[in-house]
Amino acid sequence: MASSIVQNGHVNGEAMDLCKKSINVNDPLNWEMAAESLRGSHLDEVKKMVDEFRKPIVKLGGETLTVAQVASIANVDNKSNGVKVELSESARAGVKASSDWVMDSMGKGTDSYGVTTGFGATSHRRTKNGGALQKELIRFLNAGVFGNGTESSHTLPHSATRAAMLVRINTLLQGYSGIRFEILEAITKLINSNITPCLPLRGTITASGDLVPLSYIAGLLTGRPNSKAVGPNGEKLNAEERFRVAGVTSGFFELQPKEGLALVNGTAVGSGMASMVLFESNILAVMSEVLSAIFAEVMNGKPEFTDYLTHKLKHHPGQIEAAAIMEHILDGSSYVKAAQKLHEMDPLQKPKQDRYALRTSPQWLGPQIEVIRAATKMIEREINSVNDNPLIDVSRNKALHGGNFQGTPIGVSMDNTRLALASIGKLMFAQFSELVNDYYNNGLPLNLTAGRNPSLDYGLKGAEIAMASYCSELQFLANPVTNHVQSAEQHNQDVNSLGLISARKTAEAVDILKLMSSTYLVALCQAIDLRHLEENLKNAVKNTVSQVAKKTLAMGANGELHPARFCEKELLQVVEREYLFTYADDPCSSTYPLMQKLRQVLVDHAMKNGESEKNLNSSIFQKIVAFEDELKAVLPKEVESARAVVESGNPAIPNRITECRSYPLYRLVRQEVGTELLTGEKVRSPGEEIDKVFTAFCNGQIIDPLLECLKSWNGAPIPIC
């Protein structure tokens, strides 16, 4: 019994003065530790998570497991090189001490819950056959339903099962559960060999832990005939094959007293899935900040909304960081510089302030980031906790009967995370709706149509409908799970966390937000290319109008200077101010605003020409027909020529996005993923392109370009000058 394990200053198996050694006198309630975990920026934390996710080894000792490491083990199938789990050898002694204590207490006739007693509401029953009791525990908990096959809709995703196995090992390593170290080694070998038990998707209330699903891991370890597992390539394996492939040479385990309870009485399935969900949620939170900044770029937004003073006066750290990240993306942006010139040229062309979806995006996203970050820390505390019952306190020679199996931190953090994800999605939908609406988008075409004939090209209209569907489902999922608790197990489990159910619903929300983010990113790239097309076509229109004005307005019939020559400057101002896509499909149509406003300039000058209008040689009215006829003869050809040059990849004016910090995401979508500008003239549908980007979200390809956008950010807002 001299063996020991250090846990938060408490050496299990070694007598001590608990009052002096087991409590941190400076932080007895752990609030300081919780606050300290939030030090630094959220972005730095996300970068750290990504680094941890990519490490080849996860070393378990019971106290340092992270959300990113759980996600890494869970997603091993998506990696070219599998990450491996190693157990800290220093944990062996403490694990053995608690296991030995159980066997010794059994030998002494000590009455212990789950060792000599029945379970839950039937704990009044007694038995001396501890091994048989554990065997029966696993049998009666195997109450899940799978349907047909190992990949049916009623089977927990194998990634979530791997996460649960890892988290359960981490808990048991702390040496308070009364289980042999050899069983933990066997589970580790199963993980490292990619042998995954099949667990039921439903059937747990995550209090007394995740009893039903965890019993199927125990069933595999004990060789139950109904247990199922799949191998590295998804193949079904029988009981003997599982252990042989994993290199477990000891054969199936005969559970000792308490070991069955140690395997099933914990929150690992809920907290494992929550870890996976939160890894992706943190990435999506940063993505929403960057996408909001790109939205500001393509909408000719005013960057004033990111000014540090505004957010400093509001005090919320999530808001301050969100604004600072957007400010960093927009600082020096070529789009912002161009928009500033536009606003200076015609300050009344758009509202003084941008709409809420842009202007208040830091205020909207900030609280969601704080919620997701707090939930991440709560789950990290949970996956490093001892969360079963009873707890074996070797140092005080007693079993403690409590309720650490209550997974309330999981249910609450997942409900909160899901609400935050729904709020992010709502903002994304609001921004998307502005982007595709030509009443709001500052000159982009309706539906972001890029074809020559808008009557035969409806752009992203279908995608907008899909976004409404995604957003509606996401808002529905924002409803809490934890207020639907039912009293269970003869009213013994009369309050329960529903942690896994909430985690599952949050995983659904993550998938939907990835669909929304993919659709939105494709739309933003469409808008970027439309701004590029707009700039090139407008340049062609300006040059053509200038040339036609010089040719038809500058000289009179006898070679003398004509008063109409003074119209050129205002004609070019019309071109500059008029949204190109209001006339680009037929630039000389008399029903479109370009020709109407060009004519109005000439008419206004003619009205001011006074007596000179009576002279045919100096009349501006007489020049209107010649100007319009010449423009109709050359402008459509010049516009089409400019469009063809852009489509060929050799535009007169390069794409501004290459000069922006947001370029890495555009590069990913257009070059690495291989999408292109969507038009009705092509066969490819929006869904095909969005699918490519969605795949990049799902396989993690999106992460590096996202972080590259922010690689030069120093973690602080631009100082107030």
Curated annotation (Swiss-Prot):
One Pfam annotation reads Lyase_aromatic
The answer on whether this UniProt entry bears the keyword Cytoplasm reads yes
What Gene Ontology terms describe what this protein does at the molecular function level? ammonia-lyase activity; phenylalanine ammonia-lyase activity
| Positions of the catalytic residues | Y113
Q: Which PROSITE patterns match?
A: PAL_HISTIDASE
The UniProt record lists the 5-imidazolinone (Ala-Gly) crosslink at A207-G209
Under which main EC class is this enzyme filed?
A: lyase
Q: Which UniProt keywords apply?
A: Cytoplasm, Lyase, Phenylalanine catabolism, Phenylpropanoid metabolism
Positions of post-translational 2,3-didehydroalanine (Ser) modification: S208
Kindly indicate whether the keyword Iron-sulfur belongs to this entry: no
Question: To which pathway does this protein belong?
Answer: Phenylpropanoid metabolism; trans-cinnamate biosynthesis; trans-cinnamate from L-phenylalanine: step 1/1
The entry sums up its family as follows: Belongs to the PAL/histidase family.
Q: How does it assemble?
A: Homotetramer.
The UniProt function text for this chain reads: This is a key enzyme of plant metabolism catalyzing the first reaction in the biosynthesis from L-phenylalanine of a wide variety of natural products based on the phenylpropane skeleton.
For this entry, the protein name equals Phenylalanine ammonia-lyase
| Originating species | Solanum lycopersicum (Tomato)
Name of the coding gene = PAL5
